[in-house]
Design a protein with these regions (language model features):
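Short helix-initiation/N-cap motifs at beta->coil->alpha
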Residues: 146-158, 235-249
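Extended ligand-binding regions for polar small-molecule ligands
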Residues: 52-88, 220, 286-333, 426
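Extracytoplasmic small-molecule ligand-binding "clamshell" domains
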Residues: 47-168, 408-409
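Acidic, polar ligand-binding/catalytic clefts
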Residues: 133, 137, 144-208
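A ligand-binding cleft/hinge motif common to bilobed small-molecule-binding domains
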Residues: 171-180, 248-249, 253-282
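Bacterial signal peptide processing site
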Residues: 37-40
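C-terminal motif of bacterial Sec signal peptides marking the signal peptidase cleavage site
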Residues: 32-35
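Periplasmic-binding protein-like
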Residues: 189-197, 263, 267-309, 331-358
């Protein structure tokens, strides 16, 4: 049976953050990073003394009973293609970014080997960070003309819609559901759902997790995990490194996510082993606001997608992507996997535009209005409205309005929780 595309439904639960571990939401402060493209992978090992399961859980973590109804986990529809690069020069594609003089990128800072602070230098490093540098290189001729902002996983879409960042390079799986909210590049990394467990645990597949305790980020709903496995209980943590700590303290038996994220944890503890689940697969892509949907009107969004895709095509052809993969990922994931390169037709763009219009109208706009009303009650100030935009199929997402969309079914779980995301299985 063919594997299905990875997707989950996110909750918007809030909790305290361990400041040394991860930034909350999007930090107001930003980092103009220079010279970190040469960082090399490091495998800082966690201490492995004997622990007791009675020890205090990582901050903000909680157990959830595994006896809950299963929730559909996978988005089975093939994603739409991206926007094909054109022959325009960079200055014509993204004039406002050229004028600003730097690319603003949303990244992680605690996902080892993907986006993290190198312990030796405190510089941001990782596979996704290096890809962002390559995008900046093609725009400015300088890979360091990039400003990194730390983005919490559940706020990635919001960061794009608000214009806080130009692009997000942070473990975002391309799914058709999510394409209603954001625009994606062509893929840069293939992922598979997996389990990380201790060597000698006896866990060889998801069947071995029945009656066990499984850890996952709080972005996973319990129903999703129950649909994949039959755990006795689930430990929800705020960051993935807390799952590793909990497993080292014998508080959980395994960690469930995709193999890219789990390989970063495995690199930190040689006493762990990665077990492929084989039920879902997907591809990471660079995310951008849909044309016409950013706070500033999204005037450069279609051009930015074309620019990013030009870079991804270039680094595939000249071997740069393979070199970056070998540097950061190959040690634990094995040889680089094949990546699709699919671009959509004008007719497909028009159909996607109508789906986006309905999604923004039916799901996102009410959610933002509710958030604005809540903020107004707390601060005593008024809320803000939503901006509109329009152009051709790839230069605005509102073509065709909200009518005539026969295949759009707003995700009920997403709508009820206020999530902007179609979902993924990672932080």
């Amino acid at each position: 049976m063919a594997k299905q595309h990875i997707t989950t439904h996110h909750s918007r639960g809030r909790g305290g953050r361990r400041s040394a571990r991860v930034a909350s939401l999007i930090m107001a402060t930003t980092l103009l990073l220079a010279g970190c493209a040469g960082e090399t992978p490091s495998n800082p090992e966690w201490p492995t003394p004997h622990f007791s399961p009675d020890m205090e859980l990582p901050s903000g973590s909680r157990y959830v009973d595994g006896n809950v109804p299963a929730q559909p986990a996978f988005d089975t529809a093939d994603p739409w293609g991206s926007i094909r690069p054109d022959a325009k020069p960079t200055a014509a594609r993204i004039p406002s970014i050229i004028e600003r003089g730097r690319l603003v990128v949303g990244v992680a800072q605690s996902l080892n080997r993907l986006g993290f602070r190198a312990p030796e230098t405190s510089n941001l490093a990782g596979f996704e960070v290096d890809i962002a540098h390559e995008i900046a290189r093609d725009i400015f001729g300088d890979p360091n003309r990039v400003e990194f902002r730390y983005v919490e996983s559940r706020k990635r879409d919001d960061a794009l819609h608000s214009g806080d960042v130009d692009i997000v390079a942070r473990t975002m799986t391309i799914t058709r559901q999510r394409q209603k909210s954001v625009e994606f590049s062509i893929p840069y990394l293939h992922i598979e759902d997996s389990i990380l467990t201790r060597k000698g645990s006896g866990i060889k597949s998801v069947d071995d997790l029945q009656g066990k305790t499984v850890c996952a980020s709080q972005d996973f709903t319990p129903g999703l995990l129950v649909s994949v496995m039959k755990p006795k209980r689930i430990l929800h943590t705020q960051v993935w490194t807390d799952c590793l700590m909990a497993m080292q303290q014998d508080q959980v038996d395994a960690i469930y996510s995709d193999d890219a994220i789990l390989s970063g944890l495995q690199a930190q503890d040689p006493n762990t082993v990665l077990v492929e689940v084989g039920q879902a697969s997907g591809n990471y892509g660079i995310a951008m606001a849909p044309p016409g949907r950013a706070k500033d009107g999204g005037r450069d969004t279609a051009g930015l997608v074309r620019q990013v895709n030009s870079t991804l095509e270039r680094i595939k052809k000249d071997g740069t992507l393979s070199k970056l993969y070998d540097k950061w990922m190959a040690e634990y994931l094995g040889p680089q996997r094949a990546l699709p390169q699919k671009y959509r037709t004008p007719e497909e763009s028009a159909k996607l535009g109508r789906q986006r219009a309905k999604y923004f109208h039916d799901v996102l706009k009410p959610r933002k209005a509710a958030e604005a009303a809540e903020a107004s009650l707390k601060s005593g100030s008024g809320g803000a409205g939503e901006e509109d935009g329009a152009a051709d199929p790839d230069d605005a997402s509102r073509v065709g309005g909200a009518s005539g969309v026969g295949d759009h079914r707003p995700d009920s779980a997403s709508a009820s929780t206020g999530s902007t995301n179609g979902g993924e299985i990672y932080e």
